[in-house]
Amino acid sequence: MLAEGLAVGDKIATGKVRVIPNVSHIRDFRPGEILVTDITDPDWEPIMKNAAAIITNRGGRTSHAAIVSRELGIPAIVGTGNITRAVKTGQTVTVSCCEGEAGRVYDGELKYRVDKMDVSAMARPHTKIMMNVGNPEMAFKQAAIPNDGVGLARMEFIFANWVQVHPLALTRYHSLPAEVQQQVDAVTAGYSDKVEFFVDKLAQGIGTIAAAFYPKPVILRLSDFKTNEYAHLVGGNRFEPEEANPMLGWRGASRYYHPDYREGFALEVKAIKRVREEYGLTNLLVMVPFCRTPEEGQQVLDVMAEEGLPRSKDGLEVYVMAEIPSNILLAADFSQIFDGFSIGSNDLTQLVLGVDRDSSQVASLFDERNQAVRQSCADLIRTAQQYGRKVGICGQAPSDYPEFAAFLVKEGIDSISLNPDAVLRTTKLILEIEEKAETVLA
């Protein structure tokens, strides 16, 4: 064994290693290789989708590499500590995520067995089993997996790969320096209207996901880049502040109504309107991330209405992510303005326990199964039910820990949204849990 870290998913892969020291060298990567690096961020996504597997020195189960690899359905091992020193480019290795919580990297090509499952006769549980989706190019393939819709459609992949340009670099194109205008021109070639480029590309990406799962509900999370991630988009560094802690900074709901970004958010709204009204995909619903207070939530809804996308129009439901302790403590107030909640267990665990989810040093303390996190989820479910609001979960916890999924089902959660690679095994588990519960009641 060459290295060990946290397993992401439950698959296994073999291939040749490509050690990439930083994002400036991603052009060296070849499809089918095993990507080895220190840590990833959205700038790496163009090559991640072509990797046989991903291994990083740093990061936890909710790091960027972990989240993206789950959505892509490829194995990943994060937080190995020294993988960039333990292997060399061109070396053949086996990446195993099928041995429990620990992921292991072995030298050479090991033999393994593939188990297949016939899903044609699989029953549907009472709890809705939804899916986390981010890459439109994978949407139709993933839609073939038995599901009840998309509980989390991530917009960030479309931003980074289909749009690539910061929204304000398009709305304020004429104020940009000549060299930045040239970069924007290169990306937007074929579009005379820079704003139309953004709306069209974003609508195409969102619409592809909504179409793949139609008529099942697709809950789209509004953009949730942090400032350092927005800054990596073309022209982005001219519009984003440098923050000491972007994870807790200007992100999510706080951006949408702010005078420094409202015009950028308006473009998102235009794209959503196009998908719902022009494409006719009214199964597309909306979710507001990182909403700190009910007052902030109302401000976001007001901006959406001003831009022609009011809640309830043509059946539009608007959900809020429950990922901040205030979302739990003030759930009754949030219930007055939103149609439901989706628990973001990644950030909720981080903020309830005070643990940096991306730090390898405290990775052992980041545990969604902690009683404080479980109690927060249980309290939210009860409050949501009291006010007649739907509540689901779209964080990593149910995908990683079957016992956490079982806990949520017993608490009466309405839906569980999973990474594609966890849908079938978790569906089987939930069917068993519900069957046992019905037997006891009988």
Where are these regions (language model features)?
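Acidic, glycine-rich flexible loop/linker segments
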Residues: 2-153, 157-174
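Conserved alpha/beta-domain cores
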Residues: 117-442
